[in-house]
Amino acid sequence: MDTDFVSGTYYNADRRTPGGTYYLYYKQRDQVLRPAPNPDGSYDYESPVDYWMPFNGGIGLHDADWRWKFGGSIYLYSGSHGCINLPVSFAGKFYESIEAGCPIVCFYR
């Protein structure tokens, strides 16, 4: 299996997907992804996803129905907050094929 995807925003160190070898913690359906809350309890964003597969703290693979394009150099300036954004058409198939403990290798070329 392979697909184009969008990783963390490369030119923003706080949003770059960290390189390294990780292992899938678990997988869950129908989650809402949020950053740490602001002092007033609100969130800067809330992203509902159908497929959530975390591998490094709050960083994981998930579907991204708000994106219409994947791959290429999008990650340089318009990447994610650190997660791997997958096309909806691919995310479900990938979710069904991966299990907790599966190695995840992240790197930039």
State where each predicted segment sits.
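Exported/periplasmic cell-wall-interacting domains
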Residues: R16-G19, Q28-R109
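Cell wall/extracellular polymer interaction/catalysis modules
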Residues: M1-K27, Y51
